[in-house]
């Protein structure tokens, strides 16, 4: 058990960093100090008390990265309720499912997202609040939440007649063993799994960040990864807030142009990112330089190449704000070309490894200790083993145990049993090896999950289940080709024949329409690039499961 209490980390931080800047929404003038964040949390606690919210009740949050997203999260966990973050690009039906499956009482959401949700599909909610200003967007019949919110100033004066000061912060010290977070691994109805994360799991990640001094008091960080994603949440937000860092929240799509401008203005001391983002920056900032004829010539001259690499390194560091200690990349495999070039120019980057079920960190090494090809070193609060006769040389499933490992999947005992070994180790589903020093080398992924370039988990069966319900699709199989999803489809030729539609032109029209409709039903990171027709039924196991490994290398038509 981690000795530091997760809730007390934030009580202490608010008191110690009272006047320091805490959260700023990028592009806006308003900044919340740590003291102001604590006061906003106190207001939400009064709301919860007024509504007789119980410890252990669930509260969902969905929206872009904003100060109030962070405040709603911290208000929930410091009250003793369980927070349920939802990725903002999930489809409405998936949001409905998660809110209902988690049995959420309240929902904090962006106004535009709320407009696309259906009230009747969320009948279990007592109230919905805006992440713009915390006003009540909806209340269930018989509730008086809106009236209370309008009189919040009076409630604060009544409870804090002398004003709200750091001495008023006194959160109940909830046991680290308590579940504080439900993080859903997927948004699709029927397949989503709510990962039960305890205070101990969260404290394990945050205190690791504190011990290794990833961030310090008074430093700056730019939060652009989705806060509903375990990686960005743990370090850009939770660790940063625990140590007194100033967090600027980028509530926009992190295109290279927007990021470059934000990095220049914020000048972060640490950058947490995924391969897709850093590869785009490489493509936009570095490739135009090194592809010049004069540059290619110069890089082939001994001694001169080192000088040029140093200049390129400086240009890249300056483009990212110029003040960061290192760039930590996680969530997916890096493009080898980019990795090799970064090593050549001695760029301060490292690659970590984790998963939602570990909240998320499993392995990490600072950039000056990082071994190329590895995914970092197993944390000192975790253990790793490889399900292999020779874990140093023969690939096997990576299995872990330790402080960061989840309690299980919410209301899904079967999935929980399947993901743990009989002796209690978490089966990551990743294949790899380790070395004598505890560095992990990931060789691939087991089963069927595909990891998108921005770190999102893609479950092919979920997309296939939607596609298989579309006109004239008998079977389908989602594969990855050149980092894009392709759907192999065996058409229902019998039905096409019976309707006199079995011509290449008609089949193309039908499948084009299916592709268009399919991409409306899945998340942005699950978009299918094309449908490729397959001439026969797919080969199956005795259990009638498709033998996926036979089709992963199917080439383009």
Regions found by a protein language model. Give the residues of each.
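AMP-dependent adenylate-forming
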Residues: 9-33, 530
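Structural core segment of the AMP-binding/adenylate-forming
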Residues: 51, 78-157, 483
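Conserved AMP-binding A3 loop
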Residues: 33-35, 171, 180-206
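Conserved C-terminal "lid"/linker of ANL adenylate-forming enzymes
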Residues: 450, 475-486, 513-557
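Conserved pre-ATP/AMP-binding loop-to-beta segment of ANL
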Residues: 18-19, 149-184, 191, 214-220
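Conserved AMP-binding/adenylate-forming core of the ANL superfamily
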Residues: 22-66, 70, 74, 91-96, ...
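Conserved AMP-binding/adenylation subdomain of ANL enzymes
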Residues: 203-220, 227-314, 323, 348
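Conserved ATP-binding/catalytic segment of the ANL
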Residues: 385, 392-452
């Amino acid at each position: 058990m981690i000795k530091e209490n997760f809730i007390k980390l934030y009580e202490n931080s608010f008191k110690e960093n009272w006047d320091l800047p805490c959260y700023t929404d990028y592009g806006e003038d308003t900044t919340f100090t740590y003291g102001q964040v604590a006061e906003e949390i106190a207001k939400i606690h009064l709301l919860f008390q007024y509504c007789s919210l119980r410890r252990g009740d669930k509260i969902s949050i969905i929206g872009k990265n904003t100060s109030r997203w962070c405040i709603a999260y911290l208000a929930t966990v410091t009250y003793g309720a369980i927070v349920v973050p939802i990725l903002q690009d999930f489809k409405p039906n998936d949001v409905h499912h998660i809110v209902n499956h988690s049995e959420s009482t309240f929902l904090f959401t962006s106004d535009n997202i709320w407009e696309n949700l259906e009230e009747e599909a969320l009948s279990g909610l007592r109230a919905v609040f805006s992440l713009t200003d915390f006003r009540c967007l909806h209340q269930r019949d018989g509730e008086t939440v809106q009236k209370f919110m309008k009189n919040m100033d009076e409630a604060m004066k009544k409870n804090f007649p002398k004003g709200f000061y750091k001495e008023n912060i006194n959160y109940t010290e909830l046991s680290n063993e308590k579940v504080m977070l439900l993080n859903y691994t997927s948004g699709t109805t029927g397949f989503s799994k709510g990962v039960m994360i305890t205070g101990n799991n969260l404290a394990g990640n945050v205190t690791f960040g504190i011990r290794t001094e990833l961030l310090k008091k008074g430093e700056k960080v730019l939060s652009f990864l989705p806060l509903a994603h375990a990686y960005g949440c743990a370090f850009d937000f939770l660790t940063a807030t625990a140590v007194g860092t100033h967090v600027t929240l980028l509530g926009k799509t992190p295109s290279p142009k927007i990021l470059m401008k934000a990095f220049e203005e914020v000048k972060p001391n640490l950058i947490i990112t995924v391969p897709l983002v850093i590869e785009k920056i490489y493509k936009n900032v570095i490739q135009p330089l090194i592809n010049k004829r004069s540059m290619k010539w110069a890089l082939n001259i001994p001694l001169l190449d080192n000088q040029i690499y140093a200049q390129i390194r400086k240009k890249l560091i300056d483009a990212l704000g110029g003040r960061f200690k290192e760039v930590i990349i996680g969530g997916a495999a890096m493009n080898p070309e980019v990795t090799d070039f970064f090593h050549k120019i001695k760029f301060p980057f490292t690659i970590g490894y984790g998963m939602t079920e570990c909240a998320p960190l499993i392995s990490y090494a600072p950039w000056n200790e990082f071994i190329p090809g590895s995914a970092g070193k197993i944390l000192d609060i975790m253990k790793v083993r490889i399900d292999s006769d020779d874990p140093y040389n023969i690939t096997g499933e990576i299995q872990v145990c330790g402080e960061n490992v989840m309690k299980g999947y919410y209301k899904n005992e079967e999935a929980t049993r399947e993901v743990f070994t009989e002796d209690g180790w978490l089966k990551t589903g990743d294949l790899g090896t380790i070395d004598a020093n505890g560095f992990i080398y990931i060789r691939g992924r087991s089963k069927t999950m595909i990891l998108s370039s921005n770190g999102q988990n893609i479950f092919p069966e979920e997309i296939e289940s939607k596609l298989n319900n579309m006109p004239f699709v008998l079977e389908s199989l989602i594969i990855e080709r050149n980092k894009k999803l392709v759907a192999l489809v065996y058409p229902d030729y019998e039905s096409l024949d019976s309707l006199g539609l079995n011509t290449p032109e008609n089949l193309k029209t039908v499948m084009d329409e299916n592709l268009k409709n399919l991409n409306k039903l899945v998340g942005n990171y699950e978009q299918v690039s094309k449908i490729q027709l397959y001439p026969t039924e797919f080969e199956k196991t005795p259990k009638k499961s498709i033998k996926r490994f036979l089709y992963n290398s199917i080439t383009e038509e």
